[in-house]
């Protein structure tokens, strides 16, 4: 199996793993394997501090043949905030790369934490309107992100560049944002906007159709949060989105918008996407 995170020819079903110990993480990964997941989404920050080492992460990576994405959203298992510098947050991602993880999630506000909760740059792009979160336009910060991406590439692994603006955005805005992020040379781009109305839902579907036509080098994953967002997690992969994040149905710390793995697999089977020959 090709363990590159961007290698699949069909949308990935990524099992979300948020656990405190390697043993619990490996058990959850086995559950996802048995129920049809095609990738793993590993929240590194949820581990107890003693397990945030190359050795412990390597145990988890080596436990499966599925491609794995490492994340550090600076939140503990109970989703409370972790106080750490941007360099410390990036260092945990690099530890996972050293441990052999296939790719890491570089948040769009990386190296500029003020951009996490509001837009602080110059409002000169279509996608900087209405106070989007996690969007950086400062060239010095962008250069730091490029350096991180180049470092990961130099270690033979991939980078998913993600941003969660948390506002409704038009297709034009998202298309411009994707092209803007692509200039940093990630391997996958993930954008999560907000979708609360039927009109916004239809716009999200049309946006994904447009993004597919960009024919960029990068794989693109686009879905929404909000009242209507769950539908985009199911339908957007049909329109070209690269990933669907899935959980175990009884997980206490799952996001309400995320689909359970059994539901997602049964849906994806209708398109022949779970057949091994399509991978």
Predicted regions and their residues:
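Short boundary motifs at domain starts and secondary-structure transition points
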Residues: 2-7
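Active-site beta->alpha loop and helix N-cap motifs at the rims of alpha/beta catalytic domains
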Residues: 8-154, 158-159, 166-168
């Amino acid at each position: 199996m090709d363990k590159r995170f961007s290698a699949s020819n069909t949308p990935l079903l990524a099992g979300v793993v948020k656990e405190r110990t390697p043993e619990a993480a490996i058990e959850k990964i086995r559950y996802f394997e048995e129920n049809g997941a095609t990738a793993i989404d590993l929240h590194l920050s949820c581990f107890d501090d003693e397990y945030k080492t190359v050795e412990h992460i390597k145990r988890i990576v080596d436990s499966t043949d599925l491609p794995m994405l490492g994340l550090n959203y600076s939140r503990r298992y109970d989703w409370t905030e972790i106080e750490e510098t941007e360099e410390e947050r990036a260092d945990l991602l690099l530890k996972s790369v050293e441990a052999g993880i296939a790719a890491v999630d570089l948040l769009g506000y990386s190296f500029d934490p003020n951009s996490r909760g509001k837009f602080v740059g110059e409002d000169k792009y279509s996608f900087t309107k209405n106070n989007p979160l996690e969007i950086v336009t400062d060239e010095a910060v962008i250069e730091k992100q490029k350096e991180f991406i180049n470092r990961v590439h130099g270690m033979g692994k991939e980078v998913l560049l993600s941003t969660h603006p948390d506002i409704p955005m038009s297709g034009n805005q998202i298309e411009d944002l994707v092209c803007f992020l692509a200039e940093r040379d990630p391997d996958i781009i993930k954008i999560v906007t907000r979708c609360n109305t039927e009109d916004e839902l239809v716009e999200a579907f049309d946006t994904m159709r447009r993004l597919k036509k960009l024919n960029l080098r990068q794989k693109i994953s686009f879905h929404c949060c909000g009242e209507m967002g769950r539908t985009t997690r199911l339908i957007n992969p049909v329109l070209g989105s690269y990933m669907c994040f899935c959980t175990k149905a009884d997980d206490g710390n799952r996001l309400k918008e995320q689909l359970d793995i059994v539901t997602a697999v049964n849906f994806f089977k209708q398109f022949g996407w779970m057949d091994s020959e399509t991978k």
